[in-house]
Amino acid sequence: MNLEEENTIFKPLYSLKHSPINAYFSKNSDDFVVRERPLYEFSGKGEHLILHINKKDLTTNEALKILSETSGVKIRDFGYAGLKDKQGSTFQYLSMPKKFESFLSNFSHPKLKILEIFTHENKLRIGHLKGNTFFIRLKKVLPSDALKLEQALMNLDKQGFANYFGYQRFGKFGDNYKEGFEILRGKKMKNVKMKEFLISAFQSELFNRYLSKRVELSHFANDFSEKELIQIYKISKEEAKELKKQEQFFKLLKGEVLGHYPFGKCFLCEDLSAELERFKARDISAMGLLIGAKAYETGEGLALNLENEIFKDALEFKAKMQGSRRFMWGYLEELKWRYDEEKAHFCIEFFLQKGSYATVVLEEILHKNLFE
């Protein structure tokens, strides 16, 4: 794969096989609602205020700027567990120094409300959340499409989903990763935060491409013969047989990096049979590479061969990035839906572990690219 020759936006493969489903989706505050779920209970004591806020059609940074102007707290002194999109209605938690509490007593803003205030010992940091609950309303849904949506949701609930990075990660034109690649190759940029963001977009792009390659492998393992798998992947007959034997959609590979799901340490897949049982029980999941010097390394085998195929253009820049691992396969939790035939509305609710994108799930369900 030559990143320099890429002129089109990469589109990851879907795991489900149905045709596109017709539905209208608008990411507004009535039809897209996100509720953050904290990682821990707030203690009720300490030097930090925890603000439970509801923002509508504001980014997290825009909300912080509004609160900063009201309270006098510098933006860098606020804490948050995750950055949220502008579109939609978001319920999330922010932290700020308690000594500024009095400045919030008369706070009022049409797009930002403070719902509750707690106290806690520490400032909120990125990742200090379990995940997010999402509400999505689809409109103009015909009864025939509602049936397709129900089937797609049941399939995803049963098998899980490919945990791609969402389009939000890649900028307005979907090509932030190219800027990140240029920075790694020596292009200067003074803005350190922007530089880090663009490099992370590059890492995310490669992650998505590798995960898409694994989704393709899983489809091929289901649809092709052992002989064809041997020819395509240059693997042994035993390896091809092992792939065909796996009943679940996403196929695990010996030597790849696994992790305890949803939080836990990385380890190599050595005993494939044993790990398959844990994978089916949703105790572990496969972990894709966010390339960098400190990322847990893949063992010998097909997983490493596929990794090298995707990451070959980036290997010389590995030392310039810290690197880590990210779950490739995730699961919908607390899933429910309802269809109002009279209004032609189809409403979906589910919980995702932190770092997963509801828009990725929606694209998988609809088989449509929301970016376009």
UniProtKB/Swiss-Prot annotation:
GO cellular component: cytosol
Catalytic activity line of the entry: uridine(13) in tRNA = pseudouridine(13) in tRNA
Taxonomic lineage from the root: Bacteria, Pseudomonadati, Campylobacterota, Epsilonproteobacteria, Campylobacterales
Catalytic residue list: D85
One annotated GO molecular function: tRNA pseudouridine(13) synthase activity
Domain spans labelled TRUD: 160-330
Organism, as annotated: Campylobacter jejuni subsp. jejuni serotype O:6 (strain 81116 / NCTC 11828)
Similarity comment text for this entry: Belongs to the pseudouridine synthase TruD family.
HAMAP family: TruD
Gene from which the chain derives: truD
Keywords: Isomerase, tRNA processing
A Pfam family recorded for this sequence: TruD
GO BP of this protein: tRNA pseudouridine synthesis
Protein name: tRNA pseudouridine synthase D
Taxonomy, superkingdom: Bacteria
Function of the protein: Responsible for synthesis of pseudouridine from uracil-13 in transfer RNAs.
Listed EC numbers: 5.4.99.27
